Amino acid sequence: MEFSSLYFLYLFLPLTLLVYFLVPGLRLKNIVLLAASLLFYAMGQPVYVLLLVGLSYANFAMARCIRPGKRNTLLLPVVVNLAVLGLFKYLDFFLGIFGITVADGGVMLAALRGITNGLNSIGFAFRSPTSALPLGLSFYAFQVISYVADVYRGKVKAERSFFNLLLYLSMFPKMMQGPIVRYEQVARQLMDRRTTPRAAFEGAQRFIIGLAKKVLLADYAGKVVASLSTGGAWLAALMFMFQIYFDFSGYSDMAIGLGRIFGFRYCENFDLPYISTSITEFWRRWHMSLGSFFRDYVYIPLGGNRRGKARQILNLLAVWALTGLWHGASWNFVLWGLYFFVLLSIEKQIAPKLETLPFIVRNLVTMFFVLIGWVLFMNTSLSGIGSAFAAMFGGGTSFAGSGVSLQLKNSLPLLLTCLIGSSVLPRWFGFLWSGLFGMGRSDRRGAVTVKKGIYLASVFLFLILLLWLCTVSLVGSTSSPSMYAQF
């Protein structure tokens, strides 16, 4: 079930919030939130709820056995979680490398269908799975690995309540596509939090803005991408660049907003990556929770930059190969990760020279290389990558004669909206607007109250307008699945 579906927006979420805020006490609220999270997951893939609960209990038990400083106690949970991720996500990929032909849908999907049929034969009524990859498994695996690693490091204590750990791992706002929230960030909030009217309003505001990013920008950009032929390779790459940003950052906004409504503060995941002036800066702003995971749990433990340049390069190679593979079991993702490894390695050598260039030049050069990276990302086959680059760099039909000029003209309003939406302008406008109304100072207390009232009313009306536009769009056609749901 997608956050951007009418079923979620007007049935599941309102009912969940109604029950959550009606029940007294944090313990009952946590029970409601856990039940809603498991139901949310079951609506997508019912049989995988058993895997979610079972794997969570295994990690609960293994974490209790971890002893700080004793690596063997950490090795088991890390291996178990990586093995589960590998079986579901990478088994068919590696079998293919060794020339082993797999059945249609893959080995794990066939096995899961057999298990489902067996359970149904003894009275269960599970729907046969259509995908071998449980929803959100990559995000789940990294969250639980960060948890057991932090227990080993002594940063957090092993959770004594399986209920609390399961709630942390399965909370539906962040379960499917992150952010990758660490246990230490929410451990205290599991047992001590409250939702104020202000927090609920801020959460709703963040959610609706994220919904608008997904429905009004990402989905329409995706339609342009799908409609273009190879003659429009440059326009397709540019629209995909905006599609994936608004799709994923929109989901992150919705997740963070929902968490805020329930009293949680999740980590940020995006910070205007398309205003970056270097590849290094881009990755500090893009999917920040994934970048910090690889930094803290892979790059630094491998030695980081403390053991000489040669070792640093090898550590970067490991990080970016894993980053590519995390996104998918396909060669294009491996190439995508290695591509950024090469760019970052070169950039480290020439960074002082680049800093002398004007901001706009550095930004345009950075975005050009990011755009090339998205071409690798969006084409799942090597032949597709080759065709795209051939069309972009001289091997395709001419721009004027391919009909793309008309598509560019038709897409120009959306393109400009995406360009503005991914810039710093909306943030500046928000600061200006709040300064004019919400943060205005006055000698009279009543005047300040009136200004704040006008500000809140204007924001409320703007959010209602966005929600209405999203609803109209969703009634006309269903929203496309979130792009990172497959990861």
What are these regions (language model features)?
Residues 1-486:
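Membrane-embedded transmembrane alpha-helical bundles that form the catalytic cores
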